[in-house]
C-alpha cells in the first residue's frame, strides 16, 4: 500500500504514522519541479517493530491533528468524565457528533485535494464533511486513550472516511460502536448524522459489503 502525503514548507513539524504494522517501509520524498511534474529528492527504508500495536492510533498525526490544549480534547474530557468504560466513552463521543453536527454540502462540493481537517474549527462550526467527522471523533477518542483508526476508502462508489475503534476486551471493531447484547451496529458517523438514524440509513451502514477500506491513519 502506498501512502501519499503533502509536506509543508513552513518549518512546522508533522507526524506521519506507519500504520501497516511491523515490517520494512520505503520512504520517498519528491520535489515539485514544474506544474504537475515531480522529481525524487530523497529515499530511504525503515524497518519497524512496534512495542505496542496501538501506538500509531493513539497519537496525533497530520490527518488527526490535535494537542493537549485543543478544544476537541476538552470536549472529549467533558463528554467522558462520568463514563466508566471504553464502550461508554465511545458511545458518548459518537452520540455527540451524530446529534450536533450537520453535513457541509457546500464544502463537499468545493473541497480541494490535499485538504486536512482542523478539528477545533470543525468542532466550533458543528459541521463538516466525512473527513471532518472522522478526524474529530478520532482526536476525541485518542485523547481518551482509546485506539482509533481514521479509515479512508469507499462506501459503495463514494470516496468516504469513517473510524474503527479498539474496545478493551473485544478487540478492533470495524466501523461499529453499539452492542445491544447480541449485535454490533456499524459506526459511520457521517451517514448516521445526515440520515438522522433513519431505518434506510441504518440498514445501509450496518451492511459491511457497502464498505471497502484503502488507507488507515
Per-region residue spans from a language model:
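Catalytic cysteine-centered active-site loop
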Residues: 107-110, 116, 126-127, 148-157
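Short secondary-structure boundary segments
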Residues: 25-49, 100-116, 120, 130
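Hydrophobic/aromatic-rich core segments of domains that either
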Residues: 132-217
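Active-site nucleophilic cysteine motif
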Residues: 89-93, 126-141
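N-terminal accessory/pre-domain segments preceding catalytic cores
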Residues: 1-87, 173, 208-217
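Secondary-structure boundary elements
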Residues: 60-124, 173, 182, 187, ...
Amino acid at each position: 500500500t502506498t501512502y501519499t502525503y503533502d509536506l509543508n514548507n513552513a518549518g512546522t513539524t508533522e507526524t506521519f504514522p506507519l500504520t501497516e504494522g511491523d515490517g520494512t517501509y520505503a520512504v520517498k520524498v519528491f520535489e515539485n519541479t514544474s506544474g504537475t511534474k515531480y522529481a525524487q529528492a530523497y529515499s530511504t527504508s525503515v524497518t519497524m517493530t512496534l512495542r505496542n500495536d496501538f501506538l500509531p492510533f493513539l497519537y496525533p498525526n497530520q490527518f488527526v491533528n490535535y494537542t493537549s490544549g485543543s478544544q476537541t480534547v476538552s470536549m472529549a474530557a467533558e463528554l467522558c468524565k462520568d463514563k466508566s468504560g471504553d464502550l461508554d466513552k465511545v458511545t458518548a463521543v459518537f452520540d455527540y457528533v451524530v446529534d450536533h453536527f450537520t453535513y457541509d454540502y457546500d464544502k463537499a462540493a468545493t473541497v480541494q485535494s490535499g485538504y486536512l481537517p482542523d478539528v477545533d474549527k470543525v468542532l466550533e462550526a458543528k459541521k463538516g464533511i466525512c473527513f471532518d467527522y472522522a478526524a474529530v471523533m478520532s482526536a476525541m477518542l485518542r485523547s481518551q486513550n482509546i485506539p482509533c483508526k481514521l479509515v479512508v476508502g469507499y462506501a459503495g462508489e463514494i470516496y468516504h472516511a469513517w473510524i474503527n475503534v479498539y474496545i478493551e476486551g473485544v478487540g478492533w471493531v470495524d466501523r461499529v460502536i453499539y452492542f445491544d447484547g447480541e449485535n454490533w451496529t456499524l459506526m459511520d458517523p457521517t451517514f448516521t448524522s445526515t440520515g438522522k438514524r433513519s431505518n434506510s440509513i441504518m440498514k445501509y451502514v450496518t451492511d459491511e459489503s457497502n464498505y471497502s477500506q484503502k488507507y488507515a491513519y
